[in-house]
């Protein structure tokens, strides 16, 4: 698949990388149709973070579910979903309190987890053709069919 890869400060390129894949039964794969470039991405682009070279950028994503893990119950292939940038598990103490930005499962020992963001876990970003979404029943916000025509508007919900 093609993805936007961080190579160091002021150096990003679209490269061919291995396809994202389902790793756990609660994962889904989303074909990304829209992704935002956020002002926060500039921190990494300009080298003001410890973002590792070779990582895929992109923490504000939206797209169509193309594959589901065996443990996914709510999300279905073909669903159009918005993916909030915070990656949560949905069942830890913090997630149950609504503090998903401080999930204790997805990036233990630090503040929260996010797709393709410095110091917020090893989750790859969505500036790629495919994105692995963990704990999909919790992290995928289902959108109505008419959302396809307004995907740029709905993508803003991922921030």
Spans of features found by a protein language model:
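Short structural boundary motif marking the start of a folded domain
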Residues: 1-4
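Conserved Rossmann-like nucleotide-binding pocket used by diverse enzymes
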Residues: 13, 38, 64
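NAD(P)H dinucleotide-binding glycine-rich loop of Rossmann-like/cofactor-binding domains
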Residues: 91-159
């Amino acid at each position: 698949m093609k993805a936007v890869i961080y190579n160091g400060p002021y150096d990003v390129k679209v490269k061919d990388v291995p396809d994202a894949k389902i790793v756990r039964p609660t994962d889904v794969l989303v074909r990304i149709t829209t992704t935002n470039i956020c002002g926060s991405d500039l921190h990494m682009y300009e080298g003001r973070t410890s973002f590792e070279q070779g990582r895929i950028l992109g923490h504000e994503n939206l797209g169509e579910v193309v594959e589901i893990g065996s443990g996914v119950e709510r999300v279905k292939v073909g669903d159009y979903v918005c993916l909030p940038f915070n990656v949560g598990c949905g069942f830890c103490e913090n997630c149950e309190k609504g503090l998903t930005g401080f999930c204790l499962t997805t990036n233990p020992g630090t503040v929260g987890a996010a797709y393709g963001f410095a110091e917020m876990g090893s989750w790859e970003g969505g500036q790629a053709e495919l994105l692995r979404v963990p704990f999909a029943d919790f992290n995928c916000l289902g959108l109505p069919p008419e959302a396809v025509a307004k995907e740029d508007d709905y993508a803003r919900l991922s921030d």
